[in-house]
Amino acid sequence: MRKFLTQYRAPLRFTLALLPVAAAAGYLVIRYQLALYDPATLAATLAAMLAQLGSTAVLLAVGTAQTVVYAAVCGFFGYLLAEKLGLMRPFRLEKRPLLRTLAVSLPLGLLFSLDYWTFGVWLPGTAVQTSAAAGLTVWGWLSAILYGGVMEELFMRLFLMSLLAFLGWRLFFRREKQPPTRVIVAANVLAALLFAAGHLPATVGIFGTLTPPVLVRCFLLNGGFGLVFGRLYRRYGIQYAMLSHAVLHIVSKLIWTIFA
């Protein structure tokens, strides 16, 4: 046991530091979803869940615990994979990468906010406006920063993108001592597509259905921005992907608060 703790001290410390954030993020995102989803869809979903769990409090507890478990697994193994790939950097912010990340993230937040005035106009109904309004609640702000900014980057970039890159390296370029850049880029693209696909259930919850324009919105907003987060992870470290994702949400929500 002592040997294990000594050998894996760094990934264990990293993972343990994230668990309180994971607990808060898991609780907040469920609170946010309860305010966000289309009432008819939510009623059916909740009815099925509550029939199994018994109460909203249990639903919140289970959802929170689930996020903590995912964070523990993805944090620990993601750290190890990132180390093998040469992508794990000291978990601190440095001036030049920080400024470059902010220079990218502030315009991204502006672009993301345009969803309200583009797809919000082009798509029938008021689902986009309702989603934006729900995001301006306390639950929406906090879950966007902690779950979107930290947890989603932990799951999708540190773990999934690293796993895909590691598999691509070992399966197709095993003779290379270091993973080729093209493998990591391909892993970023695939992880971004899977990140967007992972938002399809939430998209159905918001819009009640999937149409071609709704699918375009889902993959453009999530997959497109996911590529940027993945590049920041590859260039500077996972903390900059987390920061960029969080800043995107903060900027877009500030714009909606002032102008929408």
Tell what function each PLM region has.
Residues 139-260:
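Transmembrane helix-loop-helix hairpins at the membrane interface
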Residues 2-20, 60-64, 92-107, 239-243:
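Alpha-helical transmembrane segments and their helix-start/interface "positive-inside/aromatic belt" motifs
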Residues 59-71, 214-221:
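Alpha-helical transmembrane segments of polytopic membrane proteins
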Residues 39-59, 125-143, 204-214, 260:
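Membrane-interface interhelical loops and short amphipathic "cap" helices
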Residues 84-151, 166-178:
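Juxtamembrane helix-loop-helix connectors linking adjacent transmembrane helices
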Residues 19-41, 71, 75, 113-121:
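Alpha-helical transmembrane segments of multi-pass membrane proteins
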Residues 33-61, 69-99:
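Membrane-helix interface linkers and caps
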Residues 68-86, 155-172:
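Transmembrane alpha-helical segments in integral membrane proteins
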